Amino acid sequence: MKFTALLHHLTIDLLRGSFYSLKRKAAPGVDGVTWQEYETGLEDRLIGLHSRVHRGAYRALPSRRVYIEKEDGRQRPLGVAAVEDKIVQQGVVTILNQIHEEDFLGFSYGFRPGRSQHQALDALSYALLKKKVNYVLDADVRSFFDKLDKSWVIKFVEHRVADPRILRLVQKWLNAGVMEEGKWSETKTGTPQGSVISPMLANIYLHYTFDLWVEVWRKKCAQGEVVVVRYADDSAPRARKAERLSSAQLLN
């Protein structure tokens, strides 16, 4: 089933709730506006933002590129969105959650309502202690957020969403680019790691490219018991037979 009319759910009340769900001390985006500054005159700001979104006049700002150091010493690029972009993104995430929570599989734990890292670890622990598994494959999709194919992201969103206004919003965020040291650059692939919308898009993408494939593989190809736990782009399949896990490595 596709949903053809969704934008009307993006109300001022939803935008207000989205604003107050944001981190108060988060770094500002390219416009330099902090959460506290945006809260000043909030109702007028939200009325204006709501109007621009529904008139098609809303423009997504580029993300501000920052880097954090990874455990191995390499730099991980993050994209810091402007407050207004975060508000609209969170509102759209809330709407999309109502649709995709009906679709997402049980072994997906990352960035979902009512689910957490602790639950993923509990599922992993339970499988190791209670299930008949002897091997564990710890898989991480390399540079996943940076390398996402934008056209396929849109195609996967379109499986359930047929409201062109929602699709245009997603396209605006994917194509907003990044600002680094005052210079704008286009992002030909990927979605900014650190943005509000990215985890939702990642889960939709992986639902169709990984989760559904794993379900078929587990039922038709695997010999013995196979348990899968996925948290965003990290997964940990566990099985009784090593050769079955080695065949699953081809996916990653």
Regions picked out by a protein language model, each given a short descriptive name:
Residues 45-48, 52-66, 71, 103-115, ...:
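Conserved polymerase palm-domain catalytic core
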Residues 1-55:
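Surface-exposed loop/turn segments and immediately adjacent short secondary-structure elements
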Residues 77-78, 82:
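Conserved phosphate-binding loops in nucleotide/dinucleotide-binding enzymes
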Residues 84, 88-93, 135:
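Duplex nucleic acid-engaging cores and interfaces of nucleic-acid transaction enzymes
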Residues 75, 89-90, 193:
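Glutamine-centric residue-chemistry signal
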Residues 2, 14, 18, 45, ...:
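Residue-level detector of well-ordered alpha-helical segments, enriched
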Residues 9-27, 63-67, 93-99, 177:
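Short, compositionally biased low-complexity segments
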